[in-house]
Amino acid sequence: MTSIKTLIIDDAVPYAHEIFSHLGQVVTLPGKEIDADSVRHADALIVRSRTQVNASLLKNSAIQFVGSTVVGLDHIDQTYLHRHRIPFYSAQGCNANSVAEFIISALFDLAEHHSFELTQKTLGIVGVGNVGKLVAQKARTLGINCLLNDPPREEAEPRKNVLAQARGENFVSLTECLTADILTFHTPLTQTGKHKTLNLLSAERLQQIKPHQIIINAARGGIIHETAWVQTQTLANVIDCWEDEPNISPPLYQTAYLATPHIAGHSLDAKIAGSQMVYKHLCKVWNVMPQDRWQKFLPPPPEPMNVTEQTTMQATLNALFRQTHDIHKDDQAIRAHDINEVHKKYEHYRRHFPVYREWHQHQVNVTNNPHLYKTLKQLGFQLI
């Protein structure tokens, strides 16, 4: 008789019971409460970013599989898993579109607030992986000039560089990229190696930043030297990722035009994609046929939207983006005069983050504006 398997799953994984229950008994726990005792007799562990998966957690456990439904890897001791032959899967790319849409929304908000035309600015994208390439794709659709910096990709894809150069899409040095009007970072956090990204935007490099420039970090805390960043005069900072979360830096917090609690990749679609990717891989490891009955539990699609045209195309798009996800609400949700209160709000908002859907889930009614129709279609909206 086959024993029923036990799966310990972070309770922030959406639809955990609906997706995973046919594989065994599902036990959900807050990520920070998953400890050695809770996984001791479990067969699978599925986490987000709040659980440190290492020897102290797993050494006396029966865990046969570890899955992470988020893209970051700094909470996973992959060396330990490999040494003990524990299969591991991370949902790389699951939230890339969500983060890219957050960046584009922030760009349009900044442009309207500071009264500049995005088509007259240059966007420097540092890190052109799953997220960065989508940011570039969407930005170029919207007529924004981009500079791309990604040394690991540049080295790994030398044959592609000739074709990319012909399209005007070749990589540039970090020094050149940092001359862009707006800088957005999309690298992993790596602390060693030839291309380490810890303090990639170092105190020395921050001295080169000019007061008209904008810095966005929706990648990882630690990529930008936070102490030096506080002393750097910029037009604006948009910060979604911080060192030592949720105990974010009070001085840096005060500099942010938009301060959000690491939620750029938190669309419902991104979370479901992460769960699904891990689920399908676990089914493969356990030789089980995947099921899709969980889909009937999803919320209905958003109500169709009518576009209210503004005086400019940029203003029209900004208003539409705010209809789909108003990032100012994310900022206001953690704002407080007392930094200790900010820290409390930070964690609470992440755990109780409101549901929002990505652009491809939204139906938009556009009349008598072929250019707007084409642009929205290229961005993934459903046109009616």
Predicted features and spans:
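N-terminal glycine-/charge-rich "phosphate-binding" loop or analogous flexible N-terminal tail
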Residues: 1-42
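Phosphate-coordination loops involved in phosphoryl transfer and adenosine-cofactor binding
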Residues: 3-4, 119-122, 212
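Phosphate/diphosphate ligand-binding glycine-rich loop within oxidoreductases
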Residues: 10, 44-116
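Short, polar loop motifs at secondary-structure junctions
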Residues: 10-16, 31-34, 49-52, 150-155, ...
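Glycine-rich adenosine-cofactor-binding loop
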Residues: 10-11, 92, 100, 119-140
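NAD(P)-binding Rossmann-fold cofactor-contacting core
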Residues: 14, 141-162
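Rossmann-like adenosine-cofactor binding region
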Residues: 53-54, 155-250, 379
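Rossmann-like dinucleotide-binding domain for NAD(H)/NADP(H)
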Residues: 212-374, 379-383
